[in-house]
């Protein structure tokens, strides 16, 4: 087996094998007719086998019908004698095919013809994005590192480079390995007219591989919104803004497949994701408030006044630049020297960087202000609810306690959680937090401290 064949991805090798198996040498119409099965009376048998023979060997139809792995549809990929607007097989195409098989071969059973089309398409699979990416030859000039600076004026630093490289690796991986784990959204943030949406559209290479039509994450037909697209833009983060909760957003981005039944099919099927998601926002505080971390969102600030060119100034040149950037990305992908995640150091930087893009956390601010003035060494959730959040006469609900716990554990530094309940004079036995460097207490441990709690000694523990 030669080196060119070995360099192909396994999926591409299998697709080529399927294509070669399906591509029987075309024969003349008379030769095909002579080889068709007949009935006892000498007529053409209306069988799937006969229909399949025609689709495989007819000089017009041989190699014409293929299954598009990206769109999950059947395509007609070569001229077959009538005008067509797109490659996807549609109802009008079927009428022409039925007419051709009836007039040329006497085959008239529509169901058997349709079954034969399904078989021949399945034996002749292709993936347009894989074919495109595999055809690229890199010229050796580095572009990923400078792309966002070139078109959008972003900082030309390691973070911007790693952010775009990670996104490109995710997109390539999803094309060659549908359903692979990739839950990252590259988010371009900056003023209107900077070219953010255009960047994602051109990044998709072909307009039909791009979509900005995703408005709701809980749409029952979300698979139809993703089907056939490679780069999905969430314009102004509308879909995440309309989400019911941060957990819904996390779940959607983490999903690796959709389970969906295409109309007129009998059974639902797993549809592994072949797309990645990019976000655009004019507003700075676009990130959803998530105290446990927004690691799925990678914001990059853009400054169009610093861009070397506007992306639409010369669209042909911009497309050529992006094509060579994909060629560079394919070199990285083929090398295998990449991960679909940030390094630990970059993750730490991202966590700090994201704070600039989150809405103000008013409750965390109130608790921090309270603790800055508080002179005691221990606090509990109930105390913070009543004293820091000003609910002196209310009892906290369970979700409010969980929210305070999350703030203390995720947003407040200098305090350490203790899991074993201790006695607070105002609030009873409670779990809570203690200062990491409390002042030395020289008093009797049974005496009330400045916090209003009594330290429980071993002798004071309840005997049950």
Annotated model-derived regions:
Residues 117-227, 231:
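P-loop NTPase catalytic core of nucleic-acid-dependent motor ATPases
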Residues 3, 7, 15, 21, ...:
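A composition-driven signal for long, intrinsically disordered, charge-rich low-complexity tracts
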């Amino acid at each position: 087996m030669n080196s060119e064949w070995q360099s192909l991805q396994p999926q591409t090798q299998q697709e080529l094998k399927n294509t070669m198996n399906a591509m029987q040498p075309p024969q003349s119409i008379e030769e095909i007719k002579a080889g068709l099965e007949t009935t006892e009376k000498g007529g053409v048998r209306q069988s799937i086998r006969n229909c399949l023979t025609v689709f495989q060997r007819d000089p017009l139809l041989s190699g014409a019908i293929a299954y598009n792995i990206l769109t999950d549809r059947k395509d007609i990929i070569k001229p077959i004698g009538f005008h067509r607007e797109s490659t996807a097989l549609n109802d009008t195409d079927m009428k022409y095919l039925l007419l051709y098989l009836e007039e040329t071969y006497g085959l008239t059973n529509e169901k058997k013809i349709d079954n034969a089309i399904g078989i021949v398409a399945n034996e002749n699979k292709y993936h347009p994005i894989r074919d495109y990416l595999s055809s690229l030859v890199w010229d050796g000039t580095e572009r990923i590192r400078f792309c966002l600076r070139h078109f959008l004026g972003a900082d030309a630093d390691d973070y911007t480079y790693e952010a775009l490289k990670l996104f490109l690796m995710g997109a390539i991986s999803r094309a060659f390995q549908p359903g692979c784990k990739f839950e990252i959204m590259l988010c371009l943030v900056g003023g209107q007219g900077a070219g953010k949406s255009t960047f994602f559209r051109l990044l998709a290479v072909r307009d039909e591989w791009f979509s900005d039509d995703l408005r709701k994450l809980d749409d029952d037909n979300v698979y139809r919104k993703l089907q056939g697209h490679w780069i999905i833009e969430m314009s102004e983060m509308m879909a995440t803004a309309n989400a019911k909760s941060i957990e819904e957003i996390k779940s959607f981005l983490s999903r690796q497949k959709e389970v969906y039944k295409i109309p007129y099919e009998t059974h639902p099927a797993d549809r592994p994701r072949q797309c990645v998601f990019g976000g655009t926002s004019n507003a700075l505080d676009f990130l959803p408030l998530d105290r446990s971390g927004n690691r799925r969102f990678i914001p990059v600030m853009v400054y169009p006044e610093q861009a070397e060119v506007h992306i639409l100034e010369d669209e042909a040149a911009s497309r050529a630049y992006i094509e060579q950037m994909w060629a560079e990305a394919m070199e990285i992908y083929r090398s295998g020297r990449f991960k679909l995640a940030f390094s630990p150091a970059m993750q730490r930087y991202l966590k700090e960087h994201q704070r600039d893009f989150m809405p103000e956390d008013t409750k965390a601010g109130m608790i921090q202000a309270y603790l800055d003035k508080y002179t005691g060494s221990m606090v509990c959730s109930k105390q913070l609810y009543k004293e820091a959040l000003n609910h002196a006469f209310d009892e906290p609900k369970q979700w409010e306690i969980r929210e305070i716990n999350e703030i203390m554990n995720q947003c407040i530094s200098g305090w350490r959680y203790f899991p074993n309940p201790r006695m607070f004079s105002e609030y009873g036995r409670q779990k809570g937090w203690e200062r990491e460097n409390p002042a030395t207490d020289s008093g009797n441990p049974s005496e009330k401290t400045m916090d209003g709690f009594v330290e429980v000694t071993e002798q004071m523990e309840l005997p049950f």
